[in-house]
Amino acid sequence: MEIDFNRIAVKVGSNVLTRRDGTLDVTRMSALVDQIAELHKAGIEIILVSSGAVASGRSEVRPTKKLDSVDQRQLFSAVGQAKLINRYYELFREHGIPVGQVLTMKENFSTRRHYLNQKNCMTVMLENGVIPIVNENDTISVSELMFTDNDELSGLIASMMDAQALIILSNIDGIYNGSPADPESQVIREIEQGKDLSSYIQTSKSSFGRGGMLTKTNIARKVADEGITVIIANGKRDNILVKIMNNEELNYTRFIPSPEPVSSIKKWIAHSEGFAKGELHINHCATELLFSDKAVSILPVGITDVIGEFEKDDIVRIIDFGGKPIGVGKANCDSSQARETMGKHGKNPVVHYDLSLLQI
């Protein structure tokens, strides 16, 4: 293996795993498992984030009455996940590789304790040669707390597990500099930090999934900013994973990772904006200090308002003097104490500078 990654996360999209009628493409699944098994036997730790449960279930059961979107997802995923994981179990067993099912929810990433509990579980699996197969637990997720799609979930998993690379497998070769349907368009091979891609990205989503290229790009940027290589490639290309790891010449998009290391807790905070329990509104002076070159904590004297109820260690949004969200941070106290000390000098920080991220 020419690319020196010891641990990778691989996300397989619904359009890779399903045929047009929604049934599982077992031939494609088998080919992907063969590739993952080859990498696993070469000593690479792999976490598989697999879509396909809802699409799989959709082809197995027909509702007796009209269901809303959440009820449909719960029904189809309950049936489809059993079918999906059973197929993975059988395919990996042919290679003598044990797998473990990890069903998670967005809520499980909202507190540091739950976050670390999940990380520990999957770390133990990897240490014992087990490949974790991760999916969202759609059967008990509610619409407002669902992941945008499994691209978002895979980004969280790659970050949480300190993966060196996240490979997102879709049904196109990567990000194009025009419409993928245009024969003149070409795949953008490398994307550096800060490169504007807005003119290239189409907002359409897949037939069986919730995600589109815009979501993939946003997740890829965030994960690459944490020092993790992100690759978007075509999961229907023969032996794509092995070819990527062998650094063979082929079309895919690679997001160049930041060279700066990011701490585990900052990785968690970077993905936690959607879990914020409250808001800290700060004045003009505090806002300017936060964006200066100095490492500055959020002190009570700079806080003008505390919105919502939160406990110590919860994630809170940081709102500037104009009402614009500028970041998130880990609260150093609960909301009652924050209100009590608000505007006062000589008090402990409400958010320490090490535990905040601006302009996420």
Identify the residue ranges that each predicted region occupies.
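C-terminal catalytic "cap/lid" subdomain
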Residues: 1-65, 70-98, 102-360
